[in-house]
UniProtKB/Swiss-Prot annotation:
<feature type="binding site">
    <location>
        <position position="68"/>
    </location>
    <ligand>
        <name>Mg(2+)</name>
    </ligand>
</feature>
<comment type="function">
    <text>Condenses 4-methyl-5-(beta-hydroxyethyl)thiazole monophosphate (THZ-P) and 2-methyl-4-amino-5-hydroxymethyl pyrimidine pyrophosphate (HMP-PP) to form thiamine monophosphate (TMP).</text>
</comment>
<keyword id="KW-0808">Transferase</keyword>
<dbReference type="InterPro" id="IPR013785">
    <property type="entry name" value="Aldolase_TIM"/>
</dbReference>
<feature type="binding site">
    <location>
        <begin position="35"/>
        <end position="39"/>
    </location>
    <ligand>
        <name>4-amino-2-methyl-5-(diphosphooxymethyl)pyrimidine</name>
    </ligand>
</feature>
<keyword id="KW-0479">Metal-binding</keyword>
<dbReference type="InterPro" id="IPR036206">
    <property type="entry name" value="ThiamineP_synth_sf"/>
</dbReference>
<feature type="binding site">
    <location>
        <begin position="132"/>
        <end position="134"/>
    </location>
    <ligand>
        <name>2-[(2R,5Z)-2-carboxy-4-methylthiazol-5(2H)-ylidene]ethyl phosphate</name>
    </ligand>
</feature>
<dbReference type="GO" id="GO:0005737">
    <property type="term" value="C:cytoplasm"/>
</dbReference>
<feature type="binding site">
    <location>
        <position position="105"/>
    </location>
    <ligand>
        <name>4-amino-2-methyl-5-(diphosphooxymethyl)pyrimidine</name>
    </ligand>
</feature>
<comment type="similarity">
    <text>Belongs to the thiamine-phosphate synthase family.</text>
</comment>
<dbReference type="Pfam" id="PF02581">
    <property type="entry name" value="TMP-TENI"/>
</dbReference>
<comment type="pathway">
    <text>Cofactor biosynthesis; thiamine diphosphate biosynthesis; thiamine phosphate from 4-amino-2-methyl-5-diphosphomethylpyrimidine and 4-methyl-5-(2-phosphoethyl)-thiazole: step 1/1.</text>
</comment>
<feature type="binding site">
    <location>
        <position position="86"/>
    </location>
    <ligand>
        <name>Mg(2+)</name>
    </ligand>
</feature>
<dbReference type="InterPro" id="IPR022998">
    <property type="entry name" value="ThiamineP_synth_TenI"/>
</dbReference>
<dbReference type="InterPro" id="IPR034291">
    <property type="entry name" value="TMP_synthase"/>
</dbReference>
<dbReference type="GO" id="GO:0000287">
    <property type="term" value="F:magnesium ion binding"/>
</dbReference>
Amino acid sequence: MKLRGLYAITDSQLLAGKFLAYVEAALDGGVTLLQYRDKSSDEARRLREAEKLRELCSRYKTQLIINDDAELAARLGVGVHLGQTDGPLTPARALLGSKAIIGSTCHSQIELAEQAAKEGASYVAFGRFFNSNTKPGAPAATVEMLAQARARVQLPICVIGGITLENAEPLVAHGADLLAVVHGLFGADSTQEVTRRARAFNDLLKISV
């Protein structure tokens, strides 16, 4: 499977009261990967929401990714995204199997991406590239670094951090395969606007939905 397209990431606070409606609106516009990101300790609720997302993703032929929780991903039979504080990828690969999608946060360090590739990552993520509400303290990445990463890393490259329709084009031009978006997608006033934005991100990547 070629990993290229819009990578939608949920935010529980941003989507409060409209969670499934906005997610489905995004899926309707075309989403390659959907990451369920919820840092709360309410495991029962997280399982409930993740199961609903798995059902939606199945309907729209989108791959579901769980943030930072390989055990939940294994329980649901979906992929996982791991940060640098979540340990090596090898145990997650062993747990989830050879076909699961596993992503790795690499901040702005190409060496981390090369290591992740050796450990069996499906894609690597660099960022933040712009000011971000979700990760305000994350180390900054540059388009120059992205171009270098594209030359050195064979895996699909995901970019994250304050990405909007207005600033995404240079990232695509410098080698990004996946545009990871939170507020730039879900910070919309209506489900119709979420769908429009999703389609517009796919247009930037020359992907027809």
